[in-house]
């Protein structure tokens, strides 16, 4: 890095009055900082970043400033950083280090590149894998959860969760009709399979697995062909609800919390069909009669092809690992939108940008996908789901779908366009530049909260109507960082609760 680049970063930090998801500052004027290994780990595990040593962050009342103060000894600090990265991390971190003089003061700029997915997690060896692995969240370094560490290791070691045995299950737990159709299709598609027994076919396709000379159904087999998978996995269902308003806490005219509410169970094909039926009966349909032909055309509130893709992705590509046995998928129908919450965020090295192309992508549940392809009916085209959603929404003259890769979930949101004044245009940026959107919103909140504000006031000021999601995403984060505080801290859920910047 050169002087101009560093000065530009400092200027941006002063404008935002905050560090960012990829920029961290350390003073190091009087000596080596006591702790920065967490930032090296978090940058390596998240999206990379730059640590600037020799920058002082100073907080005064309503203002935070970043000032060049220089480091105690640039060469000694550089050696210390190099030794730390090469000896104390697994895997070894190879930083790019530059010493830049600004107004007679030395700045040590350390660039940390994000590791490829198969090398994660990067952890600080003295604290061990489970205590020394970090991830960057906003401007802070958080310990990775057990689940986040498991995702990295299972991906690296090519663990297939959908091939895990269901030891309590037997062949009697399969739906014979669906399984028979699958075997017939498999033999038709691959005539050589006619030479195999049915059990051999099921073993080859991953419907069954052999463990210590015993045959068990797999997770994939039970979820695709099971009579009642929830016998073994009670929480692997779809919770479908209709909210009589624009946010989860809104009540209807008669005080009802939900206009419709259903627990959708069964195997994957059954949950897929029932979820489609649930949405169909809870969305508006416009009927148009042609003046010329007299023929009737039904136009649904949301395009059916887009809905089918969102539902199939949510059920098929959810996380079926041991860490998510207690978590269900969720469809929430609001007045202005539908949200599909997929258990587990994007798999492996997939990104939102990659999802919007037709390039081959990594698949979390390869066996489930293969079984459904052979069975037919749900999966028709590989790797076109996201582009299909976008195309169908565009053809219906509806807002572009929103794809949000959260820490442990992946959320798809369709807006129906009936309340354009409520549609958060700013959310579009989230798909391409998460950091920009988040940091911009954080900045607006801090500027607005120089006076006491309610959560609704803050959300509306920032252009959001989904108060609950806004509270989880932004207000909670700023509270945890100590940048804002509650006016009634002893009663967090008090209806008169307000927020103000923390001086």
Feature annotation, model-predicted:
Residues 296, 457-468:
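Short helix-coil junctions and helix-kink-helix linkers
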Residues 487-503:
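Short, cationic-aromatic polyanion-contact patches
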Residues 231-238, 349-351, 357-443, 447, ...:
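Flexible, glycine-/charge-rich segments associated with ATP-binding catalytic modules
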Residues 1-109, 116-118, 305:
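Polybasic/polar functional segments that serve as interface/processing modules
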Residues 465-480, 493:
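Short amphipathic alpha-helical interaction segments
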Residues 91-171, 325-327, 383-387, 391, ...:
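Intrinsically disordered, low-complexity regulatory tails
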Residues 133-325, 330-336, 341, 347-361, ...:
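Active-site helix-to-loop segments that bind/position phosphate- or nucleotide-bearing substrates
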Residues 448-457:
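Short capping segments at the starts of secondary-structure elements
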């Amino acid at each position: 890095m050169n002087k101009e680049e560093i000065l530009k970063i400092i200027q941006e930090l002063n404008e935002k009055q905050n560090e960012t998801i990829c920029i961290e500052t350390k003073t190091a004027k009087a000596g080596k900082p006591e702790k920065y290994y967490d930032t090296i780990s978090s940058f390596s595990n998240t999206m990379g970043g730059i640590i600037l040593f020799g920058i002082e962050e100073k907080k005064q009342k309503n203002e935070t400033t970043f000032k060049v103060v220089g480091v105690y000894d640039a060469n000694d600090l550089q050696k210390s950083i190099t030794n730390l990265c090469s000896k104390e991390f697994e895997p070894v971190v190879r930083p790019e280090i530059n010493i830049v003089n600004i107004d007679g003061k030395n700045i040590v700029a350390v660039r940390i590149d994000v590791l490829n997915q198969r090398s994660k997690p990067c952890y600080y060896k003295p604290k061990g894998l489970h205590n020394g692995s970090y991830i960057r969240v906003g401007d802070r370094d958080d310990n990775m959860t057990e689940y986040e560490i498991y995702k990295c290791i299972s991906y690296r070691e090519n663990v297939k969760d959908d091939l895990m045995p269901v030891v309590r299950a037997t062949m009697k737990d399969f739906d014979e009709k669906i399984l028979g159709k699958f075997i017939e299709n498999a033999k038709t598609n691959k005539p050589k399979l006619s030479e195999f027994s049915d059990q051999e076919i099921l073993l080859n396709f991953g419907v069954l697995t052999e463990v210590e000379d015993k045959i068990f159904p797999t997770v994939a087999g039970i979820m695709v062909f099971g009579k009642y998978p929830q016998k073994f996995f009670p929480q692997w269902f779809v919770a479908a609800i209709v909210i009589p308003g624009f946010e989860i806490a809104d009540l209807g005219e008669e005080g009802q919390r939900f206009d419709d509410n259903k627990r959708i169970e069964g195997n994957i094909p059954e949950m897929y069909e029932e979820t489609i039926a649930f949405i169909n009966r809870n969305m508006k349909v416009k009927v148009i009669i042609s003046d010329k032909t007299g023929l009737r055309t039904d136009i649904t509130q949301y395009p059916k092809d887009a809905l089918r893709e969102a539902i199939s992705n949510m059920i098929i590509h959810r996380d079926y690992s041991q860490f998510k046995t207690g978590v269900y998928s969720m469809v929430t129908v609001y007045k202005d939108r539908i949200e599909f919450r997929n258990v587990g965020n994007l798999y492996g090295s997939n990104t939102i940008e990659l999802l919007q192309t037709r390039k081959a992508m990594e698949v979390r549940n390869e066996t489930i996908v293969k079984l459904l392809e052979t069975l037919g009916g749900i999966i028709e085209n590989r790797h076109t789901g996201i582009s299909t959603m976008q195309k169908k929404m565009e053809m219906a003259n509806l807002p572009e779908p929103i794809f949000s890769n959260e820490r442990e979930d992946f959320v798809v949101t369709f807006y129906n366009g009936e309340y354009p004044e409520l549609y958060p245009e700013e959310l579009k940026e989230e798909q391409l530049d998460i950091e920009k959107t988040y940091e911009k919103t954080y900045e607006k909140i801090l500027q607005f909260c120089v006076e006491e504000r309610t959560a609704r006031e803050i959300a509306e000021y920032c252009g959001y109507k989904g108060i609950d999601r806004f509270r989880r995403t932004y207000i909670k984060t700023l509270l945890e960082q100590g940048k804002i505080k509650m006016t009634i801290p002893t009663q967090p859920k008090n209806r008169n609760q307000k927020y103000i910047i923390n001086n």
